Amino acid sequence: MSFELERIDIEKDREFSEIMHGKDAAKERGLLSSFRKDKEAQKIALDSYFGFWGDKCTSEKNDIHQQERFKFYATLTRHYYNLVTDFYEYGWSTSFHFCRFAKDESFSQAIARHEHYIALHAGIREGETVLDVGCGVGGPACQISVFTGANIVGLNNNDYQIQRAKYYSEKKGLSDKLKFIKGDFMQMPFPENSFDKIYSIEATIHAPSLEGVYSEIYRVLKPGGLYASYEWVMLNKYDENDPEHQQIVYGIEIGDSIPKISKIGEAEAALIKVGFEIIHSEELSTKNSPLPWYYYLDGDLRKVRSFRDFISIARMTTIGKWLISSFIGLMEFIGLLPKGSKKVNDILLVAADSLVKAGKKEIFTPMQLWVCRKPLV
């Protein structure tokens, strides 16, 4: 796959973020933040994102603009998170990833355990300098820094998320341990051999080329250092010639800003090709978990374990999704929410439905763990 990456205009991106979200946007959280967005900037982000998908909010497969999604993946992903970050925080708090669930384990405990698990496998130690590739709003970085005592640098190409990550780290008293830097993980703004350890949690899926992002991770990791990743990949049961499988995959891609999801073998081959030694490989989605990783997306009230779970899962029932979508549509109609807010919510529902289908068919995992070493020589 050959394509030229776009150049990142850091100042232009920062100015757009301040216009759309406001300079003090980090102090607000969740859907309440949506009421204060600049409506014209929101429309620009919306038109830009859906323009890469033929302006459709559907899981119906459309590959017309796929090459543009590869070349301009940074713009695609940046505007996606301009649009969905508030929705993510509303539904998922500050750690935007899936996890396994132990018996009677709360959502926050399960999320933290998943983060501790990758930190343990990466061998992260106190005082080390660690890179979080695609750090979101900093939830995992905060948790892993507290767990290990490491100094963590979060890399992100979305200014709004960086603003929020800095706010959360300050609020937790971790400003001296955490830094958040604007940058493209396909073109990292760091010299060679900068980090003792590196991890990524469901982030490199946004890359137009896994070989490209892995080569950058390899470049900035110190010789002998470890890289651990939770990767989204298609499993061996996936049949790329099956129309139903194709539709499910496309629903995940359009709903999660993914240029193309790789197969598990392709991702592993990319790690090896850039020079990594794979020292541990583990597919976690069906391992030692009484509940599926998509538990909170499925809307199955029969599996509810607590009243708190009931509130979260009720939102994902058919009637719950309809009520929330209708409310957002009404707020948009009367002008309290920016135009396109319902469209954003609807595309997230497409993603959720597609992820659940993929999980039930066991053709996809969001938690293929690889631990890799960069050779000393």
Swiss-Prot record:
pH-dependence of activity, as noted: Optimum pH is 7.5.
Pathway: Steroid metabolism
GO molecular function annotations of the record: identical protein binding; sterol 24-C-methyltransferase activity
Reactions listed under catalytic activity: lanosterol + S-adenosyl-L-methionine = eburicol + S-adenosyl-L-homocysteine + H(+); eburicol + S-adenosyl-L-methionine = (24Z)-ethylidenelanosterol + S-adenosyl-L-homocysteine + H(+)
Family from the record: Belongs to the class I-like SAM-binding methyltransferase superfamily. Erg6/SMT family.
GN (gene name): erg6
Temperature-related activity annotation: Optimum temperature is 37 degrees Celsius.
Record-linked InterPro entries: Erg6_SMT_methyltransf, Methyltransf_11, MeTrfase_SMT, SAM-dependent_MTases_sf, Sterol_MeTrfase_C
Protein name: Sterol 24-C-methyltransferase
Note, other: Cholesterol is the major sterol found in P.carinii, of which most, if not all, is scavenged from the host. In addition to cholesterol, 41 other sterols have been detected in P.carinii, but ergosterol, the major sterol in higher fungi, is not among them.
Matching Pfam families: Methyltransf_11, Sterol_MT_C
Keyword annotations from UniProtKB, A to Z: Lipid biosynthesis, Lipid metabolism, Methyltransferase, S-adenosyl-L-methionine, Steroid biosynthesis, Steroid metabolism, Sterol biosynthesis, Sterol metabolism, Transferase
GO cellular component entries: endoplasmic reticulum; lipid droplet
Top EC class of this enzyme: transferase
EC id: 2.1.1.-
PROSITE patterns xrefs: SAM_MT_ERG6_SMT
Superkingdom in the source lineage: Eukaryota
GO BP terms, alphabetized: ergosterol biosynthetic process; methylation
